[in-house]
Amino acid sequence: MVKTNVTIMRGGTSKGVFFHESAMPNNKNEWEPFLLDVMGSPDKRQIDGLGGGNSLTSKVAIIKKAYTSDIDVHYTFGQVSISEEKVDFKGNCGNISAAVGPFAIEEGLVKAKEPMTAVRILNTNTNKMIIAEVEVEDGQVKYDGDVTISGVPGSGSPIYLNFHDAAGSVTGHLLPTGNSSEFLDTSQGQIEVSIIDYANPLVFVEASSIGLDGTELAEEFTDLQLAQFEELRSIAAEKCGFASRFSATKLSPAVPKLAIVAKPEKYKDSTGAWHSSVEMDLHIRMMSMQKPHQALAVTGAICTTRALSVEGAIPARIAKNHSTKVRLAHSSGIIETMVEPTGIKIVRTARRIMDGTVYTHGDYQMM
């Protein structure tokens, strides 16, 4: 057994366990078993660890101060599988990224500057830069505010995330297969997809091509449909070179992510609120770790926004408009992104929930 310091933070619509890299095992080969131990995986309830039994709450962030002039902190993201002995380090989580800036400031890794502190974050999973703009008041991170985001109760201070030059985040190419769209052979026949890698790799499929209307809520998908979605995602994973289609669920469960898109249409979200078609530019339903995402991943929103400018890509063909402000409708509501000369920006909120000590079952050589 070992014990080490942890912080639990909410970032956007996700919640994760934050570690200083100095609080991790010295041997990086032990990171995966250590994190599985901490989170209580594999177990669908994660009853014996810090995980919440949901892909949105089974996440970790490992932070280290940078000592170069153009980067403030290094940030490594891990998606901890609930049911498998696997931690996927391939991609990033944009929602968890929203909490990295506040964490870095409060831990003294970045000097607080009022009224806004810009934190330059290098995501080591993708080797891409994220600039987080965090409000500061009286030398402290400001959490209270009026910003609301779909999928999170209450309101908070805005945190602006700007994803810089995020093309080819995992595969090295905006179009991993070289095609803006292509047909994949599945057990259900040929299905057209667009595979695009920006902030994270996504596989886009039009809802109507798989028998959906695109307004379905996360809880409405059947087990059979989820299996069909995973088959499609696994074939795309093979196309990206991550794993064979037969082993992708085990070896590359987090990326690419499947995104089902549809033209704007009136719908009722999971809170019971109605949204008219004029409030949105595109419907999107994303899968995360073989389950429906309850909202929309930030990296999914960023990738979708970039996809709107890719000629021939499915999202670009069916979106309502291609302006600098993009409105994406998901199960929990609507998320907005902003296209700027320096990248794609999105606003999130975050909150520090607790600090404490976690105890493991196993013994690890700590730093």
Curated annotation (Swiss-Prot):
The answer to whether UniProt assigns keyword rRNA-binding to this entry is no
Q: Which organism is it from?
A: Bacillus subtilis (strain 168)
**GO terms for molecular function, please?**
isomerase activity
What the entry lists under InterPro entries is as follows: PrpF-like
EC numbers listed for it are 5.-.-.-
Q: Which residues form a coiled coil?
A: none
**What family is this protein classified in?**
Belongs to the PrpF family.
- The name under which this protein is listed is Putative isomerase YraM
Report which superkingdom the organism of origin falls in: Bacteria
- Keywords in alphabetical order: Isomerase
